[in-house]
């Protein structure tokens, strides 16, 4: 029997505000445990929350960027449950009156475009964090994160494969980063994702029993967890067993999911309107003001790169997948490097050297990479030497001109100097020279290689080919 995979994602994006959603405590990551707390964060009796206006503004920005409807009358609600990292016994969230509804995200997988619907986005406060002791069988509670503003983005169950879910997650991440409302750091927990997944017989409309996947702290883990859960549910169904509705944790060390608890429904949380916060009313004027302030988004940036820099669509897609990468590319070009050559170097040499790290952590500045590419264009160094220089730039952050000077790597373009070596090589390889003249033109690589050995890779390759052609065709 064939099954269809149905996936919906719930993305929790920490909004990049200086203070928390309902109090003036800092949202700084990495502070000493429980140092950024106050009676409001901790849910002490008699305190009242005050809504951070920036949280509303950032939520509207994301709604506008995804073609969603902004609910100009929305309301906070209490989501009631007990957990050690939730000191109030409830989370202030939104339920039946969220700030954003509808909208969509367009993704592309294997060259095929698809629109993924958005159900809703709502504002809420983050919970604290449990830190499990490596030695003692205890867990410590850090409440610094409590009250950090979150925007939860809930998709429609429109994804039909882990690959589509991965593409959707990356696209949402990119939009948040372009809007500069979330830093998107999955390792620090500022961009988190839960997945609801079920299988149903191909052609059936009714959804199957779903499970919820948690603890996926990287894009790679999201795809791996979804692929595992698809296989697990398919195996159960093929064996005639039932899928149990439950919450599962992904264990990246064991590459498998483990049961956490039964999956809750909305009624389990006993939502009711928050009595401490009045409903929010958003004016048309404020929405239009925010709309006018929206920056260029990934799709717009991609279209501009194709037109302004004559890049292919594939190159433009890759360069605009991350806001910082797009900015780096434009800085390289602005410093004088050729757009296409800049794109090629960034997508091959630079990304390979980074090895999955963010461009923000790159030790090479855009102006330095531009200077290196200009040295190649001007014939000062060869492309091969440039790769060696670039590796040292990545390691030390040194200017390319200094590396080339200190290591005496300037390209040899003196025709007289090279011609003497060319004649010497031809004279020493009589048989290869005769074979070349007989039609084995691929031997040109052999001759140029000999020249590169003698010049330690510094010979101008274009001039080398020209000189060998003359010498071998006398």
Swiss-Prot record:
Function field: Allows the formation of correctly charged Asn-tRNA(Asn) or Gln-tRNA(Gln) through the transamidation of misacylated Asp-tRNA(Asn) or Glu-tRNA(Gln) in organisms which lack either or both of asparaginyl-tRNA or glutaminyl-tRNA synthetases. The reaction takes place in the presence of glutamine and ATP through an activated phospho-Asp-tRNA(Asn) or phospho-Glu-tRNA(Gln).
Matches recorded under NCBIfam families: gatB, PRK05477.1-2, PRK05477.1-4
GO biological process: glutaminyl-tRNAGln biosynthesis via transamidation; translation
Gene: gatB
Name listed for the protein in its UniProt record: Aspartyl/glutamyl-tRNA(Asn/Gln) amidotransferase subunit B
Subunit structure: Heterotrimer of A, B and C subunits.
Keyword ATP-binding part of the UniProt annotation: yes
Pfam families referenced in this protein's UniProt entry, alphabetically: GatB_N, GatB_Yqey
Entries under InterPro entries matching the protein: Asn/Gln-tRNA_amidoTrfase_suB/E, Asn/Gln-tRNA_Trfase_suB/E_cat, Asn/Gln_amidotransferase, Asn/Gln_tRNA_amidoTrase-B-like, GatB, GatB_C_1, GatB_Yqey_C_2, Gln-tRNA_amidoTrfase_suB_CS
Assigned protein family: Belongs to the GatB/GatE family. GatB subfamily.
Keywords: ATP-binding, Ligase, Nucleotide-binding, Protein biosynthesis
Top-level taxon of the source organism: Bacteria
Record carries keyword Membrane: no
Enzyme class: ligase
Enzyme Commission code(s) on record: 6.3.5.-
């Amino acid at each position: 029997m064939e099954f269809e995979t149905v996936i919906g994602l719930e993305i929790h994006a920490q909004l990049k505000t200086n203070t928390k959603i309902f109090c003036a405590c800092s949202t700084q990551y990495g502070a000493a445990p429980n140092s950024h707390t106050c009676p409001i964060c901790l849910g002490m009796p008699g305190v009242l929350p005050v809504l951070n206006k920036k949280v509303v503004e950032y939520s509207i920005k994301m709604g506008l960027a995804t073609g969603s409807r902004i609910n100009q009358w929305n309301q906070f609600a209490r989501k009631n449950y007990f957990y050690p990292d939730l000191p109030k016994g409830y989370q202030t969230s939104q339920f039946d009156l969220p700030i954003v509804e509808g909208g969509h995200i367009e993704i592309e997988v294997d060259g095929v475009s698809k629109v993924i619907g958005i159900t809703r986005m709502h504002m809420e406060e983050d919970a604290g964090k449990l830190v499990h002791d490596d030695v003692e069988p205890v867990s410590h509670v850090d409440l610094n994160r409590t009250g950090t503003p979150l925007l939860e983005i809930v998709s429609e169950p429109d994804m039909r494969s882990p690959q589509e879910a991965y593409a959707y997650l990356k696209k949402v991440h990119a939009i948040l980063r372009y809007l500069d409302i979330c830093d998107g750091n999955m390792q620090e927990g500022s961009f988190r994702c839960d997945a609801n997944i079920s299988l149903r017989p191909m052609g059936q409309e009714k959804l199957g029993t779903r499970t919820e996947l948690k603890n996926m702290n990287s894009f790679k883990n999201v795809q791996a967890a979804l692929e595992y859960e698809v296989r697990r549910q398919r195996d159960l169904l093929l064996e005639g067993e039932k899928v149990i509705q439950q919450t599962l944790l992904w264990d990246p060390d064991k590459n498998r999911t483990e049961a956490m608890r039964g999956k809750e429904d909305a009624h389990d949380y006993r939502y009711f309107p928050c009595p401490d916060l009045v409903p929010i009313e958003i004016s048309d004027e404020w929405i239009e003001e925010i709309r006018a302030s929206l920056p260029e988004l990934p799709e717009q940036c991609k279209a501009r790169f194709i037109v302004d820099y004559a890049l292919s669509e594939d190159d433009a897609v890759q360069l605009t997948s991350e806001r910082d990468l797009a900015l780096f590319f434009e800085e390289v070009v602005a410093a004088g490097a050729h757009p296409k050559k800049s794109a090629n170097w960034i997508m091959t040499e630079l990304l390979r050297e980074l090895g999955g790290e963010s461009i923000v952590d790159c030790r090479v500045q855009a102006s330095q990479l531009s200077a290196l590419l200009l040295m190649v264009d001007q014939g000062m160094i060869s492309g091969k030497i440039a790769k060696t220089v670039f590796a040292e730039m990545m390691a030390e952050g040194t200017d390319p001109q200094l590396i080339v000077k200190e290591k005496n790597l300037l390209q040899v373009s003196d025709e007289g100097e090279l011609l003497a070596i060319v004649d010497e090589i031809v004279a020493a390889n009589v048989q290869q020279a005769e074979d070349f003249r007989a039609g084995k033109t691929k031997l040109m690589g052999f001759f140029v290689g000999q020249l590169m050995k003698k010049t330690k890779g510094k010979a101008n390759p274009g001039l080398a080919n020209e000189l060998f052609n003359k010498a071998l065709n006398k």
